[in-house]
Each structure stands twice: as structure tokens, then as C-alpha cells.
């Protein structure tokens, strides 16, 4: 009886565990798991196809092949359950045990586990202090190792060859010492290790040693020893006596048709191990010669190696078709391994896919689902309903009925589908908006209909894209789909908080057309009392859609147009008429939807979006816009411009021929001229295409007026519907400069445009760019996907998990200014953040925002009006939450427009927001057809505001003609208004001519400074006579005759002589060195390699004149290609190729004696006004680099002293975490800004926080850390608090910046790390440490098949029960509301009467 009860017992819940531990398996453990030993390599009998006894598929060990049936057929069926057949020894039980029962192989000699032998650093070698090479010699039976030296002079662990051993035996006698070879010897040595003692000795050695290399070596060994000590693993378990055999159904043998068998590679690998093991056993029994046994042992070791990790050592074992066999490690590794193929990505049932087409009359929350698809997807629900309604009595008859597609079935399908959302997904799903929920509407045909407004989120178009449909089954799933994933709940983009549901293309065109005004249109100037009158007049054809009229709206007379009044009918009243009383292009429409969302909430916005969609399509159709050839107006002045440019270019060629400029400068100037002319032609063309004159009658008189053009091409670009000024330029202006495949710009531009047609040569030049674009796209898509994967992996466990961490720390944030221009105003950067302290008005002192209040739109306005320049806010970077992040530090959830909720997976959102545009950008390179777009190099400064000039830190020299020249590189020109408030500040480049005086009043647009953008000059501060020093023809300087010009140029070259320091000195008439006025040092100027000397020996020179100039490199086009790798480089925290040295301290620059081809730069700090040479820092900079500081300059800590990007690790060391974070955020933003992509700073901050999670221990104090160990910050702080509370010494650490790959691999969770990269390495490390994974991140829970600990899967919601009410047949209120508003619509859903916003209820 008891058996029966057990049979119906619920199986244990496989998910009821909280953590997973991984450790080494001891031989006893393996035997304990095993159900029997596999002794024979046979698999199945070729005649009966039954498994061989004791073979790899043996039924006695692994269980029966058929359910409840023993192998010989004596016992069959359930009644014999649990009996063991006395004939064939098979237990009568379900056959599925063959998926879980293990066997084992007892080895004749211990072998090393290859992971612990070869996975660097070798753990076995580390513990025994033997190099990997020597260890392999022992294991693969090539030399002997001394186990016990006894009285001989040998060392324990020393390797000796066979000859030497025999010699020693002769000297000292047979049993004077013990040696061993192969696995037994290594196992002996591991067994004799005392880990406790080893640990203590190593700690002592580390304290006593002085050599850094030794300390590192001890630390490495100590790490492994500690791991064994703490985890309870025994070192000898790294050697295997017993090998587990995995269940046969996991390495199946499948009969193919034609009598052949397909088998898993593991069976082959196991067979080799068993064969060799059996042979070794036999040889040992026969007492075979040592050399044969040794060879067999080596072969056994190799066979076991291949089974665990084929190809890791020696030759890869291949199958009959020369394909490497897949070992146990390969089953886990890589994209096709267990982790990524089956655990992180699974196929989903109840899903279908089809091509998508546009559904212009769908509502925003709907999608069109083909009937045949719906019938298949909702089958179980239909069967249930058919039975419930009494159409059928059994599931079988329901099936038949559905197959026949009887009319009742369709009625029931309608019923089933109502209010049952489905998920639509378009691959690649780059961010969470790539999967959204919709309510299905049944349609005929086979294509899914998609709402046009959600295309932007899915990045879908209708050129053959396919989408997948998934059905959420449970009530909870349907609820989540409706509440969280419904398209109507995803109006804002999580990346930047701006609406993502904005009209595009035709819709924009239609709305733009209807809000434009046309001069002399029918009914112009009429006055109406209400919008209803305008509608009536328009319906009766009395007024033109674009006529300018006056209408009373909300009690005020408004000058407007008919079209705008008609648009007003569909806009919520709260938005106000002024928001739409203008020409609405794409940007304004986005603004309108944003405004509507902020003022009236989600529901109204959805209704507005749908109505704007209908109006847009309707009016775009009515407008009848088309393109004709003559719409591409070629500017009349084009030829004139081209002639002028050619003249300029030939002048520059002449200058080059006369030797006034170098070839590089000539190239740069030519490119600049053409870039400028292309711009001019484009401007001229835009002017002609964008304005038109029109004549008409007004009060009986003919008159002519100018108005914005109705040229269709212009309309499309101006409205933002399609195309850009740049594309129009190529159609009707000139194509302009093109780039070579290498990225350089070809200096002859394409002067033709597409309307005129290109010549063969021009066409050929333009194919370069196009092809490069396509090739780039293919490569970059992969790169971008990989970047996203790394970002997700590093940030997956950043979850909002507490409300307030209580930190007192935050960041100062100001407007982002570059080149005097405000790129991002303060308001945009602080919107949605939380204030750290009270923010006070600087003038009145009133509180604008209280501490811990969210800075919303209203407060941003107040802060901006108060004129503050920076605000202290809370940030993810300074959040003190241990794991995860707190609500207050994160601030606003961008996709919802309110504070973030606990449980939001902000890390993944951040990763998607950064990764998604990466892919977008990569896919959008080729749209401009490779045309090189370079803005003419900036070479001057103009002010934008009136005010007076102040110089800040600017050192100048007056030239003989009275102009000032800037002599330092960190000077700035500041413009202040009358009250002394700073309006703008500009950095002045070294060597610039300054054209304004200090204190001068200037109007806007005055030229304040100008410089040569193509060369960096070296100027003299004093006048005198030039003398060359160490400038020797052919050694440090080459004088090259320019063939073209016949003139010579002196260029400084790298000298073979390390002592040579080419320099120019300035002397007085008597030949004495002059002193520099700023630093009292002698006036000698060192010339960097590659500089061109412009003065001759013995010339007289005046202050501010150029001694030499360094040409800037030829400019390449900026393209996100520079972008993606740059972003990856920043997130990986790599040292840039030519990293700029940055100053570690504040001080004064001087140059020392050069060494080995490097220049010595010295920074001397000043203490109380005097220079302390004892504290000076020295830097060696290779001669080829261009140093941007000059002798006597003052530098601040963290300032770059040469061209190039800074190394983030240096910034962290010198300036600390906040500055580093600011640098990373700004640099990443810079790349995206170039592409016009908006990402909120907090996303990048979230990733940077994950990169800065760890500390490197520099001094261990009395803690258990090791020197140079990397630990999580909070672990470090906790340990220190504990130690200090006991009155001991705390550890000291320095913050550590890890690249995203490194950070992912060093997470707490080994499951997450091993599924990311380097699977074997991570698992080896984890096993030795006996690591426990507490399943805190998202990834490890997905792998274990549990709910993720975020969102609705938070532990606190685990025991919530959902009460399900029976559904009532109420009509969706929103439907009703919309039916009311769209009552009788005109064609294409244009409302034909005024529509208020009298909608009620909520969906």
C-alpha cells in the first residue's frame, strides 16, 4: 500500500533552493553517485540493439530502456515496479532514470584533471611549486620526481632523469631515497601537503621578503592554498582515481535509417578511456615491463584529458570525418554551449511568426492577427470554450471541429481573443521596446498588421520584415503584459525620457502640410467666431485648408490658419492652442506629444497620437505631394562659386610651388576650400528652394509676396518626413568631397549633382564611400551586438533594491560647454534627478528645491531662471546601497516620468540604452552614400553676446605690429555683462593672434582671436638673434629639396644619437643667452620631431614670431567607426594607443636632459611660493609625441601634457572616482552626440558604477585579505568595520577601475561569469574556492529557471496570490470613449465634426 501513496506524492519542487555551491568531487563522492562500474567499452548489441551488460549503455547500471520492462523481458508492466530482475539485474522502473543515473570508471592509476593542470595559472603546479612544464614531464611519464630525499643531497620535488636516478642509486644504495613518476607520484605529493601549514609559511614569507617579484609569487600560491584551506576541498582530489560516466540518455546512440547509428562524441571519448584503462589493468596484472606500462599510463592520461577538454593539450582527437570530437568542456562553452544555447535562450511554444504590413486604422493598443494564426495559437483556449459552451463533449471531438473550421469555432475564437493580449517581437531585440503587448484584432490574410506609430520602437519597416507573436498563458502573465508591456504604456523611451511614439514620414508630411500657411489662399483674412464655424466653412469649400484666418479660441482672437483650427479639434484642451498655432514639423510634433503626456497623462496622449495619425495620413493623401525633376532647383550661382574655388585652389598650389607652405598644409587648405564651397552651394540652393514668390489679388490689387516654398522636395526635408538638407544638396547642389576607402578625403570633389548626372570618374570615386559604408555595416553590427552583450552582463545585477541608502555624497553638475558653446544646458542634465541639499536661489536665497526632492520640469525652470551654473545632485555613482542601487540616487524612471520603483532592473535598461543606438548607428552609415562631411576647420573665435572682455590666465606677447599673441595654452577670453556676470568663456589656443584688448566693450559677433588651424606654432617670447644648437644636417635635421617648388625645407628628424637635443636659442648681439621673462630660464626652444624650422641660423627675431611649426595630421572624416571602438575602449578601460601623460601634481613645467630617445619633462610643485625640487615628478615622453605644455607653464593635477586621449586609470589615480566618472560619461556622450543620439547620463553612470565596484588591497592590516587582492567595496568596508571594532588595524585599498569584460568575470556569481566568457577558467576557480552562488543577479536565475529577482519577481511578491474574478462581458471603456470621439469620421478616419476630449474611464 505504502508504495502507492509514494507514487502519488508530489515530487520535490526543483526550484526550492536558495544557493548553489560548486566544489571538487572526492572519489568517494563519485562512487556514491554512481549506480555501477562501467567495465566494457561496448555500447549495444548489433543484432538485438539491446545494451551490452557492463558497457556504456548497460541497463543494469543506468536503468531500463523501456518503461517498466527489464532487459530480458521477464518482468513487464507497472505491477512489478521496483523489482530487480534476478536474470539480467535490471531494476523495473521508468526509463527516464537513464537521464539521471551516473556510472563510474575505476582507473588503474590516478590521472590529473586537465582543468586544474592546464587552466592558467596551473593550480596543481602552484600548490606544489613546480612549473607547468616540469609537472607535465612527471605526469606524462618522462621524468622522475623525488618524493622523499632521506639522507641524500636531493630536494623534495626535484626532477631527475632515469640515468641520473640509476647513478644515484649506485652511489647511495637502493632505498636511500624515494622517487615516483606519473599520476601516483603527483597524488602522493598533493596528499602529503598540509594546507594550514603552507598558508602560515607563505604569509610569513610574504611579510619577510623584500623582493616584489617574490611577494607576487607567494601571493599567488597563498591564494590557491587559502582557497583549499577555507573551502574544505582536498588538494589530492585534483587527481582522479574514479571518473564519473554521465547518463546514457545525455549522450545518446540514435539509429538512423539504413542501419547506421549516430552517436554523441562523448561515447567515443569514453570508449578510448575504458579501452586504455582495461589494457593498463591487464598489463599490470601481467607484470609487463616498466616502459610499456609507462606508455600506457601516458595514453590513459591523454584519453582522460581529451574526455574532459579535447584540444587543451597535445593533438586534438578527431572523429572519422576529421572533425574534432566534442568533449565535456565544449558542451558548456561558447554560443552553442549549454549555457548560451539552452539555458539563456530557449525556443518558446505558443508562438508564430509572419511578415508584417502596416495597419493604418488600428488603434495604438491593437495589432492585426491573421485568423489562421490565431486559431493555431489559441487552440487550448478554444477547446476549453467549446466544451464549456456544450458544442462538444470531449477534447477529441473539439479537435475535429476545429480542424473542420466550423462557423462556431470562429465565433468562439473572437470570444477567446477578446482582452487577451499577445506579445509581438521583432528581432534583433535591442532594447525592451523590441517586445510589446497588443490586443489582437482578427484579420483575413496571412500577414500581421502593425500600428505605424510603434515602428520606431521596433525599428521595423514594411519591406519584408517579419515579427514573432507569443501568447501569454497564465492570468499573471496576461496581467503583466497588459500593465507593463502594452504599447500604450510605453510612450516614452527608457533611454532619454522623450516620447518614442511620434508620428513619422507620411503622418508628419500631412500634419506639416495642414499647418502651413499659403499666401492668397481662398478665404484669406476671414474672421470666425468659433472652431465650429471654421469647420463648417471648410466642409462647404468656402475656405482653403491653408488660408490665413482669424478665429476666436478660448475667448481670444487668434491669427491662425484653417488647417491648425482643424488640428485643434483633436488636441486636448489642456495643451493650449499656442502649442499648435505654428508650422508643425517632426520635432514640434514630438514636443506636442511630450507636452500632452506631461499635462494630461497617458490616456489622452494615446488618443492624441491615434488622431494625429489619422489626420496626418488623410492630409498627406489629400495634399498630393509628388517629386518632379524640375523640383531639384540647381542654384544659378553654382558655376560662379566653382570658378572662384578653382582660382583659390590654384593660388594655393602656387604658394606650395613657391615653398611657402608644406604639402600637408596645401592638402588641408584645398580640402577646406572645397568644404566651404560645397557649403556655399548648398546654402544658395537651400535659399532658392526654400523661398518662392507668389502673386495674387488683394482688395482688387495685384501684389507679390514672398513665402516659404511649397517645393515638394523642400517640404519633405523641412517637415522632417524624409530626406535631409544634405541629401538635397547631393540632388541639386554638388555632391562635394568624397573619402577614399582608407578614410582620407580625395582633394578633387564631385562638382556635379544627381540631377546633372555624374561622369564616369565621378561615379567611380563615389563608389568607394558607398562600398565602405556597406562593408562597415556588416562588421559593426556584430561589434555592436558584442558590446551590448558585455554591457548587459556587467550591469545585469544592478537592480533598485532599497528606497534610500542615506548617503551624504553626490555630484556637482553644470551645463556642458565646449568651445564656448553650451552643448547641453544644466536643465536637461539635472531633470529627473534628486537634489542632495537644499538648492537656494543665489540672489534671493529662497529654497528652490528641498533636499531629497525630485527636480521635475517645474523646478528645472526655476533653477534655470535663477541663473545658477551648477547644482549638487544625488547620483548612482555615489549611492551607498550594498548590492544594487537606491531609488533616491537613481531618480526618475525615464520611461514612466516618475520616480523609479523598487525592483526595476536599471542595469539592463542602461545597457540596452547604450547598446541599442550603437547598432542603430552602425546600421546607418551608408545613407549619405559616403559623402565626406567636414565642417571647415575652426580657426577663429567670435563672441555671441555683448559685454566687456576679460583675460583669464592668458599670457600674451605684443608683436611689432601691435597685435597680441597668446603664449600659453590654458588662457581664456571671458565676456562679462554690465553686472559682472560671466556670459561666455572661450579657451584660447597657443599661438593665436588676439584681436581685442582687455576691458574692451564689444558687440556680438566680433572676431576676438584667430589662428592657423593646420599647424601648431612654436613662438619666441623674447627678441634677439637665432642660433641653432644640435641642429645638424642629416643627423637631427633633414633639408629636403621639394622637387615641385625647388625650395628647401628643414624638418627635424629622429636622431640616432640619444644625446642630441635639437633646439633654437635666442641670444643678444654679444652672443649671450637671453633670459625668458616668465621663468628666468635661458631662452632655448626644443624642437619636437617632425617640426619644420621657419627661421635660419643668425636671423634676427622679434617677440611673438614663429620659430618652427608642427603640422597637424591630415584630417580624416569623423564617422561612428571611430565611435563604436571608442565607446568599447572607454568601457573596457583600455589604455588608449597613444595615451597622453597627465600631470599628477600642480606645479611648473621644465625640461630635463633627454634619455634614450625620450624627453624628460619635470613638474615642480610650489609650496608657500617656493619651488620644491624634492617633490618634483618626472615624466619620460617619447620624442615623436607633440608636447602641448611649454617650459614655465603652470599645470594642474590631471591636466594632459600632450595630444591624445588620457588613460582612465591615470585619471582615477590622480583625480579620484568622481572625476573619472565625469570623464567617462562625457567621453561616451561625445561619441553619441556626434551621431545625434540622446542618452541620459544616468545610464552611463550605472555602467561606470559597475566598473568601479572593486578595491585593490594595498595594505592588509589585520584583516584576512591578501596583498593586491581585488574585493568588492562593501565587503572591504564591512571587514574593516569588523576589525576596527576589535581595535585592530584596518586594511588600506585603492579604488580599482575594471573594464566591463573583467568586471563581468569577477562578479560574485560564478554561474553568471561562466556563462559569459572563459567558462572553464571561471568554473575551475569557483570549484577550488568551493564558491557559493546565492543567485542574486538576473542571469543566474534565468539559467536556473527561476523567476528573476526584479520587477514582479522580487522576493517580497513571492507569496502573493492572485484572485481571479470571472470575466464580465463589459465593453472596454476606452473603446466606447473612442467610438464616441470618432463617431462619424470622414475618409481615413478624419473626424468630420469638432471633437472635445470628453473621454472617460480608463482601459
Swiss-Prot record:
Mg(2+) binds at residues 461, 463, 465. This is DNA-directed RNA polymerase subunit beta'. Keywords: DNA-directed RNA polymerase, Magnesium, Metal-binding, Nucleotidyltransferase, Transcription, Transferase, Zinc. Zn(2+) 1 binds at residues 70, 72, 85, 88. It comes from Myxococcus xanthus (strain DK1622). One of its GO terms (cellular component) is DNA-directed RNA polymerase complex. InterPro entries: DNA-dir_RpoC_beta_prime, DNA-dir_RpoC_beta_prime_bact, RNA_pol_asu, RNA_pol_N, RNA_pol_Rpb1_1, RNA_pol_Rpb1_3, RNA_pol_Rpb1_3_sf, RNA_pol_Rpb1_4. The gene is rpoC. DNA-dependent RNA polymerase catalyzes the transcription of DNA into RNA using the four ribonucleoside triphosphates as substrates.
